[in-house]
Amino acid sequence: MSTVTFFNPYLCGPRKPRAPSAGEGGAEGAAAARARAASAPFLQIVPRGCLYDGERGLLKHNCALAPRMFFRDRPYVLSKDLVWPTLPPPAVPASTTERAPRAPAPSADLLFHMYDQAETVVSADSKELIHPGYRHRITPCGVVLRLFGRTADGASLCVNVFGQDAYFYCRYGDAQSLHDRLYRLSDTLELAPVFHVRVRRVQRCSIYGYGTRPFADLYLVACGNWHVLKKMGQCLLDEGVEVFEVGVSPLTRFLLDKKIPSFGWCRLRRWHARPAHGRLSTAELEVDCEVADVRGVDDVAWPLYRCLSFDIECLSGGGAFPVAENLDDVVIQISCVCYPVGGTEEQRAAFPVAERHLFTLGPCAPIPGVLVYEFPSEFELLCGFFTFFGRYAPEFVTGYNINNFDWRYLLTRAERVYRWPVAEYTRLRFGGRFCAYVPGGGGRQPGFRTAQTKVLITGTVVLDLYPVCMAKVSAPDYKLNTVCELYLGRQKEDLSYKELPRAFLSGDAGRARVGRYCVQDAVLVKELFEKLNYHYEAAAVARLARISLRKVIFEGQQIRIYTCLLEEAAARQMVVPTFRSGAQRGAATGAGGGGGEETTYQGATVFEPTVGYHHAPVAVFDFASLYPSIIMAHNLCYSTWLRDDPGTPARPPETPARPPETPAAGPSGAAHAGGVPGATFRTPFRTPAGVPAAAAGGVGAGPPGGGAVSSASVGGRAAVSPSETPAEREPEPAPEDVFVVHVGQGVSYRFVRENVRASILSELLRRWLAQRRAVREAMRECEDETRRLLLDKEQLALKVTCNAFYGFTGFSQGMLPCLPVAASITTIGRDMLSRTSAYIEAHFAEPAFLARFFEPGDLPRADEPPPTVRVIYGDTDSVFVRFGGVRAGAIVARGEDLAAAVTEALFTEPVKLEFEKLFVALMMICKKRYIGRVFGSDALVMKGVDLVRKTACRFVKTVVRDVVELVFRDAAVAEAATRMSELTLEEMRRVGVPAGFHVLLQRLARARDDLFSGRVETAALVLSSVLSQDVSRYKQLNLPHLAVIRRLAARSEELPSVGDRVSYVLTAGPPDGRANAPNYELAEDPDYVAAHRVPIHAAKYFEQVVKAVTNTLYPVFPRGVVRRDRFLADLVPKRVYLGDEFKRHARPVEEEVCESERGGSGLLSSLDSSR
């Protein structure tokens, strides 16, 4: 019998089994025989079309042979020992069963770049081959941090860091009572008995509120079992005990306490290399070290990392959109694009891996430039892809919507359909995580997450470009095709999911066509990845905030500021309080009593604008980094806020005081007394024989400046004191050292000035803004493009993080809300804007002031009206100033000097007013809506108009843009618009429509003709709305985009995900339908409309055109007109449009010219209805 007992009957016709050649990757040698013997039977599912061209359906049968693939007509057994035929051979054995020479003893420091981390809890009975010198760190259990990266010479690396404890802080009466309480919690929570708790007294004060000295009853609670510690801290919090920094992971403690960059270079002083047969990871080098042996290195350069872009194609057994849980909805192809990221140009040019790969079911015709791997069944296809993934071992994985679809689909098929674990394909041979999940049940929480689905792969960073593009670009929809057109300037060759099955089942050539489409998507994502460079931006944020790269990607803004506060608080011997979720609102309000009423605060100021079409120059001045500058200028912070209830601890008012508790006796029955250190190390396990007590209860890595081991009681105090004594509080500062902010409604907040206590927020902002200035200066001097890009992303990360401080304090459901700080910031901002406006109107028009900044030729002559200066609008951090009679070029030349004069007169550093731009013409529509032409540019700046709104269709935007261009470019139209805005309706009745305005009316008439004549393509009529939550959670169901989703579901088509923009078109509806049917009855999927030639509702679209133009030209219409849209519609010449059934009987006639087109007033007789 031949050694090859199986070949794929679906790839080729009958053929003779070929004996494998020696050394071939697919040879059935000893490793392959072991794999076949050990492999369990699996279900083979393959489309019938792979065997019989054009046939539908699936073939299913159980197979007892080892899974395999075919590459270039050679079979390869998919085993753990497989050397992938197109990848460089691994530097270390693929399996721990093959031993490699032991690594030499380290003779120097080990320099490496870290990109990812994982934290695990390892017990003393672990099967890991751990160096004896680190065994005491995991007795009975301990945290081991896995740091993944690459060495300076490019070798992949896994560093196992021992000795980092997780800990939190807690106020309690004495250490023994606290320890006994924690011991009892272990039984209450049914926690695993393998843990060890250590308690010691420390000297810290709270960051929340000024005035408290270090607590006399504050204890640090540390434990080697991070999961146990987190639950115990939460239980204490729920029981009313005042706790601090609960939930801070040991990885975060490591990064903060040791000042380690979460994405950057590190150095190991001492380390021990693991032999190949004892490695837990698949890295080329694996070492063990103590937490104290790791040092950070200040360098932003990247080594060469591997990146993978992929895309999948699926085939539904029932013809509907594929659902992973359905057995018959199989994965048919997976494309992979491998490419380098980081490193030098020479390193990227020498990247040893081929770029394009395709994994396909069944035989496939060759595709130029693509390596094609063929598989007999879906299970083997998945096995091949994950094997390739493990062998290639990318540090970064990207794609488009891979979190919500591709990864979830692949993992569901592998784990639920085939019961096949995939965690072994991570960077850890066991104990790794390879999963996709939706935190918190799938609902979005603003400020916390930037993506709905999280994908966690140990040792690999997943960067989905779909949420990145949604955050960075404004588009009508976020399909890959649309985004590629915006960023790359080209579209992809599209293949709908309805065409795809026919092409795939048609034969080898059809599968090659599908393969080209699949590879094309992965290539486009690769180009988007390199265009956006979001990985550099995210890495810069990770370094700044000392959080992992995956937290930057998935966790939003709150965690970034929180970790920065943790680090700064620790440097000042402060602790950050933890609030119960129900008490977050109370923390945010800052209320002094126990009242349950919610306190709110007023937001930023928006001045009522002077609506109109302004021909005079309008200068825009704005404050540089308004909210950060307010924090720095006025020393605002949690730590400088003077609470009005000095006798109350710094906790939310809704958090109850800790219940009194007397010192409890230990389990042995003897009450603890005295200062015996061993008494605080009471554990629910027996010390193993031969292990010293100190080793079993090692202190590990504690926080900086740790305190002494506590005694059983503190000065004879009760176990819990409900508030600080007067001796524990700072003396009340002098009145001149207090800054008071009156926020309105009789509410005031007080903050101490910088000479009393420097604000933590101010210190962070000053440091980061100074760092940003230094980085931008380095950018100007940098000639290396790669380094310049890295520096640019670093300064952007600094800017974004600085601007996030206000939102961090003002979000009531955030991690550390504080209404006194947030309300004070907005109050001061409103006052600054008002004072700026008053100063400008009081001084800018004075002759002496103008003479300081302008030449006589820039101002009106003596026989002309004097110059006028008036503030016509103000919004949050900017003011719009209209200059009458001043030359525009002179205002631009002296704009910065004018802004500096205001800053010098009104404000102190670092507050700074800046000159932003000058409009030579501005149409102020209403608050937050305007259009203007900037001096020295032909471009129009628009805000809030339908032209820039995502909900408007392209056709409406085109018409509005044409109208705006006419108003700003055509002198006759501009003059007519100005004239019309000065008239009343009665005056217009007498004189008629200004002649130049008819050009605009003709454009609207042409738009109406295009709609009713069917000359507008469907793509230009697409409207869209965001699916903000699951359909079942909407209370109002008669919305157009929800109606479209229901229609898609009824046709078993692809459904959008939460957060997607749902596109739709308004159709004409049934012939016997209502004339004014609501939009949700007419909404339909654009692809369906285009495919079935469904007529559109021309009247509704023209109504949208008229309303959009009316909203844009709001200031132009005569005074006294109430229904402006109706007024404009009546001005457009009337026409009658015949239906198709009448057109064959119609005779062409000369089109009549309406009276209004000749400048007469005959049309105005019908305008009474618009009043």
Curated annotation (Swiss-Prot):
SUPFAM superfamilies: DNA/RNA polymerases, Ribonuclease H-like. Disulfide bonds: none annotated. Keywords: DNA replication, DNA-binding, DNA-directed DNA polymerase, Host nucleus, Nucleotidyltransferase, Transferase, Viral DNA replication. InterPro entries: DNA-dir_DNA_pol_B (IPR006172), DNA-dir_DNA_pol_B_CS (IPR017964), DNA-dir_DNA_pol_B_exonuc (IPR006133), DNA-dir_DNA_pol_B_multi_dom (IPR006134), DNA/RNA_pol_sf (IPR043502), DNA_pol_B_thumb (IPR042087), DNA_pol_palm_dom_sf (IPR023211), DNA_pol_type-B (IPR050240). GO terms for molecular function: DNA binding; DNA-directed DNA polymerase activity; nucleotide binding. One of its GO terms (cellular component) is host cell nucleus. Its EC number is 2.7.7.7. It catalyses: DNA(n) + a 2'-deoxyribonucleoside 5'-triphosphate = DNA(n+1) + diphosphate. Residues 1149-1158 have a biased composition (Basic and acidic residues). It holds the Pfam family DNA_pol_B. Residues 663-674, 709-725 have a biased composition (Low complexity). It is found in: Host nucleus. It comes from the Viruses. GO terms for biological process: DNA-templated DNA replication; viral DNA genome replication. The keyword Transcription regulation does not apply. Belongs to the DNA polymerase type-B family. PANTHER family: DNA POLYMERASE CATALYTIC SUBUNIT (PTHR10322), DNA POLYMERASE DELTA CATALYTIC SUBUNIT (PTHR10322:SF23). This is DNA polymerase catalytic subunit. It comes from Tupaiid herpesvirus 1 (strain 1) (TuHV-1). The gene is DPOL.
